[in-house]
Amino acid sequence: FVSSHVHQRASNAGLFTPPQPYDSWVAYGQSKLALIHSAFEIQRRFASDNVQGFALHPGSIYTNIASKGLANKPWLLALRNFFAPLEKMVLLTPQQGAQTSILCASQPGLRGGQYFERCAPGICSTELNDTATAARLWQQTETWVHSLQTEPLSSQSASTSRQASAHV
């Protein structure tokens, strides 16, 4: 799971009780904490089946995502564009940022259930020591996913096939 070092600012309590008022940076940190919990829970549940869970922070990467988010704020976009040459000098390229994901996916003998930063084991929040929270998050996620399924998957596939052939 691609996470972020921003998970360090999040709390387990916030995983189940959203902050009021809503703050996108707090929500971002909470989502990254949840991703790491999920990776570690996958490791606990499926290691005996040779499935490994990894979480990682790829590093700070120069991409155009900030520019797209600032499209409706011209003065902030101009400021971002002004600082872009400096950002390009200090931030990783997308190719460099991908290296930690590649390492976790392909390194023989790498032990799952770890958090990596820039191709090395990283230090994660002590909140991640709480395995009961990880199990609760797993259960809550299963509940949410099952609530989205309104009919059996085999029925959905047949229905989708009928709809697709009707449009041909």
Question: Over which residues does each language-model region extend?
Answer:
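Rossmann-fold NAD(P)H-dependent dehydrogenase/reductase core
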Residues: F1-N72, H146-T160, A166-H167
